[in-house]
Amino acid sequence: MKLCILLVVLLITVVRAEEDILENEAEDISPAIKERSARGCIGRNESCKFDRHGCCWPWSCSCWNKEGQPESDVWCECSLKIGK
């Protein structure tokens, strides 16, 4: 009987400690999530030249050069990538 009570107390202690750990992790992660949602994301066919990871899901940043243009003149926009 004493062993059963000890196991119940141990289980309660572990569960409470786990809740505290999860709460602390949520507090650490939430500023990054708030920053991302405050900044928003880049929509379809909008330029992503200066933020290549900022496209809204399911879009991704695709960049290319137009023929005859210098390599420094890159065009980027959010679009669906099909294939690779």
Curated annotation (Swiss-Prot):
UniProt keyword Cell wall biogenesis/degradation, yes or no: no
Tissues and organs where the protein is expressed, per its UniProt entry: Expressed by the venom gland.
Cellular localization per UniProt: Secreted
Positions of transmembrane segments: none
Propeptide: 18-38
Single GO molecular function: calcium channel regulator activity
Keyword tags: Calcium channel impairing toxin, Disulfide bond, Ion channel impairing toxin, Knottin, Neurotoxin, Secreted, Signal, Toxin, Voltage-gated calcium channel impairing toxin
GO CC, one annotated term: extracellular region
Record keyword Ligase present: no
Signal peptide bounds: 1-17
Superkingdom of origin: Eukaryota
Disulfide bonds listed in the record: 41-56, 48-61, 55-78, 63-76
Regions annotated as coiled coil: none
InterPro entries: Spider_toxin_CSTX_knottin (IPR019553)
Family: Belongs to the neurotoxin 02 (plectoxin) family.
Domain note: The presence of a 'disulfide through disulfide knot' structurally defines this protein as a knottin.
Role played: Antagonist of L-type calcium channels (Cav1/CACNA1). Causes paralysis in the posterior limbs and gradual decreases in movement and aggression during 24 hours at dose levels of 5 ug per mouse.
Protein name as catalogued: U7-ctenitoxin-Pn1a
